[in-house]
Amino acid sequence: MVYNFYEIILLVVLIVSLILKIPISLFNKTFVLGTLVLLFTIDFNTLSLLEWQGIIKVLCWIFGIWTINLGNSSTLSSTDVLIFCVIIASSIMVSTNNLLALYLCLELQSLSIFIIIARKRNSLAKIEASLKYFILSSISTGLYLLGASVIFVNLGVCDYTVIINEDYSMGKLLIMIALLFKLGASPLHFWIPDVYQGSDNKALLVLATLPKLSVFGVLVLLFPNNKLILVCTLLSLITGSVGAINQSHLNRLLAYSGILATGFILFGLNSEVFWGIEGSLIYLVLYTATFLIIVVGSNSGLNNNSLIIEFCNMLTQPKIIMIVLTLSVLSIAGIPPLGGFLAKWVVISSMISTGFVLSSILSIICAMIGGAYYLRLVKIIYFQQDKHFLLWKKILVPNKKPVNNTIMLGLTSYFVIFILVFPQALSQIIYWATISSF
């Protein structure tokens, strides 16, 4: 197990936040200052910052900090402390090669997310969603412990590096099923739509970003069973594309969109070649960034758990928010020349080059179906007439735009658009990270 400055800094901030009320502005300034100090004082060649574990940690850190800044709170709240726990668990997950340490990280991650979802106790929907997540997550954790026990009984060690080359080990199979559950891959996806619908925006961002990044980082290091991952990939593509067609709630649409994205992420992992894994990580980063833009951008004109038809209210918002939201939706739909198309093209081309032609054709069909309901959002934003039953929300619900949300939306949008102009800024970093995973 290798710890470095990531975990140390997060642990120090976590301890301080438990004792003092840290202002968000001071926290952001400290984060920026610490980042600049690390950039100018650390020897990147000796530290191997561009290794696979380092890149996953940096991504978890960045998206975690963005999630903490969501909202209009002036100080770090108890929810933000729980998000810190999720960030620390995600970082240690990709640092360790011990099965018990990995189990503790999964539990810390699950329990923190469970409390984040259920923190508003006066909402029955949130309580229901948190209980579903907790119970089903406990079942997957039990499968993980059973797999770890089988490995320990047979091999006498708790190091998962000894099972990397074992394709049909029962212990490895159970561990893979537990990790795929955390990732939300079909047929282990049944909890995602209900949990997403019962989550508010901050819980939704935590649930849809940090676990996916950390679990994907572990899956690449495990080199999983190709046939098991392929079955889950194809089922995820079909379920995510077909299941979202008739959805009326935004959160449920995002849930099936996440399942479809999981299918493409696992699709590159099936190839077991360099450019396939590189394409999967590029797709994961761009999907996470665009997911953040959609959630934060829709929050500017809509409420939590809104209907999709309410996107017609976005015409009353500033034009820049509409443009950014539209570009993000088109990107995640895979419309060229946006970043989402680039990521899907890299993943599908890597699969075709390794002989998965029929699976690639199926993925293209599923991407076309998925693009249809993304384009439906664009149609509602620009061409849908306003409905009379939505007028009461305009009158009774104030339209608040916290400054932090606007800053996050601008920075994330700049990143997604900048990738179109200079894709090497992301691909070169992921290139070196992927090399280190082989």
What are these regions (language model features)?
Residues M1-F438:
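Alpha-helical transmembrane segments of multi-pass membrane proteins predominantly involved
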